[in-house]
Amino acid sequence: MAAALPWSITASTILAVFWIVALALSPYARYVGRELKTVWGALPVALWALAALGTLWSSEPDWTERLKALDDFHRLWAIPFLIAQFRVSSYGRQVLIGFLISCTALLVLSYLTYFVPSLTWRWSRSDGVPVKDYIAQSGVFVLCAFGLLVAAIKSRSDGRNAAALGLLVLAFAFLANVTYIATGRTAIVVMIGLLVWVSLRHSNWRYGSLGIVLGCALLATTWTTSPYLQSRLLTLWNEVQSYHPNERTEASAAVRLEFWRRSIMIIEEAPWLGHGTGSIRTQFEKTASGQKELTALVTQNPHNQIFAIAIQIGVPGSILLVLMWIAHLWLFRRGDSFSTIGSMVVVQNIIGCMFNSHLFDFTQGSLYVVGVGVIGGIVLRGDAAERPLLRNAPA
């Protein structure tokens, strides 16, 4: 399932169904109850439960749309199930390695389709993006790059210099793809955020500050040598400057600002209960009635996860979301490499959710769920390696 995630929504969905059935029939199922008693396992389910209740008071008249909106929350159930499985299974590392190998294969194909455009097939969005879209691809590649950097640091500290060098080269191959070939602008913000996070978390203040300085120097070098990156970021500034509610524009940043402005208005109308699960489009249609230009736009996605949840199930839903993020950061509070990578999954999602509804997007949402679930299980398995419960557990 994890290996299919960078490539295909359909394949990932089919494999997820097989995984659910297999897990239900396996010895791991009996450990799920334990994880539901923890904050990191209970909060995702609590958020889902509130969304399920939200279907009862939704302003969306069509029950099909209400239940369809609830689908966006279903994947949260996978977090306690994955943690339960990989807290007792020894195959967590193999899952991560399989994911990395899959992403590396996609990286190679991305370079091939960029430098040899004739290899690009008809359903590709652009050169260098062989499957899905550049937003999903750059998000996956950024996480791989920083995960490899953490692994390289660990290898270097263990005296495995050749392995550290190889991991470092592969990490820069991922970063080069993001900065020179295909990137989402959110991915650039995530890169900066992860650079600061890893530098301060993985080192003391002295070396952390040095890491930030070196990272800034690298970003400056990339900026001066990548016209593509310059174009993406300068366009963002121009789009923000072009924003005016009563003027027509197709600039994505301006559209986001308008969606955020109207989201706040919608939330203020029903801050405590929200307008119900599935109500986003209905509420935007209401605010667009009789309007023109940007104010007449209607969307199902306000491009901010906190707003997307607050519109439907109120401020309490957004509070549950933030508490879930905090609980998952707490799960990865230790200083080992797996905890650092797990915390990066959470930080990436937090930053991404400021500009998109990433928990509701298939690739980004599944990446968060699988990352927290699998790595969380690995970390807890390491913490509890000497406990009697695990001595007779299935491997």
Regions found by a protein language model. Give the residues of each.
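Transmembrane signal-anchor hairpin modules in multi-pass inner-membrane enzymes, especially those
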Residues: 1-64, 87-101, 151-165, 206-209, ...
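Interfacial transmembrane-helix termini
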Residues: 2-19, 32-38, 49-76, 85-94, ...
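Membrane-embedded alpha-helical segments of multi-pass membrane proteins
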Residues: 10-27, 69-80, 136-145, 188-196, ...
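Transmembrane alpha-helices of multi-pass inner-membrane enzymes
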Residues: 18-23, 191, 195, 324, ...
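Alpha-helical transmembrane segments of multi-pass inner-membrane proteins
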Residues: 52, 81, 91-123, 130-205, ...
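A membrane-periplasm/extracellular boundary helix in multi-pass inner-membrane enzymes
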Residues: 181, 202-247, 251, 259-269, ...
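Long extracytoplasmic/lumenal interhelical loops at the membrane interface
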Residues: 246-261, 265, 269, 273-313
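Hydrophobic transmembrane alpha-helices and their immediate junctions
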Residues: 312-347
